[in-house]
């Protein structure tokens, strides 16, 4: 009938049996020869042929794992339901089953169908569940390569290994330092100071300079700094026409992509010049500023320091240029002093993440 299996011992005696009840659930019994009774098995896993069965506290089979197929089924009202994008306990460990219903074989972070973020080993076993609300992520064939998670007042940024690469206290004060027109020979000096104080900044680069300073851009990206788009040749975009605008943006995006494997998600128009045509054509948020240091004009480190430190407020976007030695010199004071004042130095995108976000075509001077 296909509704009963028996296990026979060495002497031909039946030592266990598994049979399907009237409600469609398998039940497992073992014969106790001491008391000469069949004992229903409860809260136990049993391997039968190429499957593992779990019998709950009532003795009903509620889970079946197919060993060779690496698939798991929940049993409800006698029906087998394939587990997809979810975690299930198999014996003593928890395992993750992907979108195809198979136990995964690639280590990494996964997002379950119910929105839980987990990290699993190469055998599919769950190492840990990562707390918080997943707000944004990138993935490759179901494995997350990065993600942003809100956990209480904290914003965490995870890498592909499930490790926190950045954490920001959303309840704390923060500002975004931005540097335009580079990279240059002075950009590395600024990165040195940022690294020393565990801080980041946003570098709005010119596409025509990217290949010459590829190592600097890679280093900035690896530090967690943001690479923004500042057009290819510092072209004033207002009045340039859609095709010219898009060429300036796309060529820069391609240059950056070639170096770090990802494109900028924000841009700054040269001189801040923009109109509706520019906003529509660039296809990214436009980032202006709330503090203009005019470092390009003064070429004076003290003036640049004062422009920042005497006017800074929570949520500011600060404009500087990494083309000048005086700006690098000023940064050696500005960065530690802002940290001492209690500011978190974040990228533009991080600032936006913590203060309501930004959209393509939107224009932003600060995030309060």
Map each language-model feature to its residues:
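Residue-level detector of anion-binding/catalytic polar loops
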Residues: 200, 226, 285, 292, ...
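Residue-level preference for the first positions of well-ordered beta-strands
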Residues: 175, 315-317
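Extracellular adhesion/carbohydrate-binding repeat motifs centered on closely spaced tryptophans
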Residues: 1-171
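Active-site-proximal beta-strand/loop segments in catalytic clefts of secreted hydrolases
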Residues: 179-181, 204-208, 231-232, 268-272, ...
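C-terminal domain-boundary segment and adjacent tail
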Residues: 196-197, 210-211, 326-368
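Alpha-helical scaffold elements lining the catalytic groove of polysaccharide deacetylases
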Residues: 219, 235-262, 271-314, 327-333
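Active-site beta->alpha N-cap acidic-glycine motif
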Residues: 163-240, 244-251, 255-258, 262-263, ...
């Amino acid at each position: 009938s296909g509704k009963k299996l028996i296990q026979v011992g060495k002497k031909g005696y039946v030592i266990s049996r598994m049979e399907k009840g009237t409600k469609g659930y398998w039940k497992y019994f073992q014969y106790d020869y001491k008391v000469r009774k069949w004992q229903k098995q409860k809260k136990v896993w049993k391997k039968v042929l190429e499957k593992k069965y779990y019998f709950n506290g009532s003795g009903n089979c509620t889970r079946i794992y197919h060993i060779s197929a690496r698939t798991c089924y929940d049993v409800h009202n006698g029906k087998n339901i394939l587990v997809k994008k979810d975690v299930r306990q198999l014996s003593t460990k928890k395992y993750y089953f992907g979108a195809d219903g198979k136990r995964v074989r690639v280590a990494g972070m996964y997002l379950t169908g119910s929105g839980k973020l987990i990290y699993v080993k190469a055998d599919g076993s769950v190492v840990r569940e990562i707390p918080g609300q997943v707000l944004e992520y990138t993935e490759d064939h179901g494995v997350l390569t990065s993600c942003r998670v809100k956990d209480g007042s904290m914003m965490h940024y995870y890498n592909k290994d499930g490790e926190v690469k950045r954490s920001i206290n959303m309840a704390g004060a923060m500002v975004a330092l931005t540097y335009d027109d580079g990279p240059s020979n002075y950009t590395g000096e600024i990165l040195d100071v940022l690294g020393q104080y565990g801080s980041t900044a946003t570098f709005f680069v010119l596409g025509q300079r990217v290949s010459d300073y590829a190592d600097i851009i890679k280093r900035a990206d690896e530090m967690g700094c943001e690479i923004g788009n500042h057009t290819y040749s510092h072209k004033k975009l207002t009045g340039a026409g859609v095709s010219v605008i898009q060429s300036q943006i796309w060529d820069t995006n391609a240059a950056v992509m070639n170096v770090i494997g990802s494109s900028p998600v924000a841009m700054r128009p040269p001189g801040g010049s923009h109109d509706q045509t520019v906003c529509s054509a660039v296809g990214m948020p436009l980032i202006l500023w709330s503090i203009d240091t005019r470092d390009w004009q003064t070429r004076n480190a003290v003036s640049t320091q004062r422009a920042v430190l005497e006017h800074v407020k929570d949520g500011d976007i600060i404009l500087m240029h990494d083309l000048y030695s005086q700006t690098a010199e000023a940064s050696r004071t500005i960065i530690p002093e802002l940290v001492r004042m209690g500011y978190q130095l974040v990228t533009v995108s991080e600032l936006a993440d913590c203060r309501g976000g930004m959209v393509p075509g939107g224009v932003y001077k600060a995030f309060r």
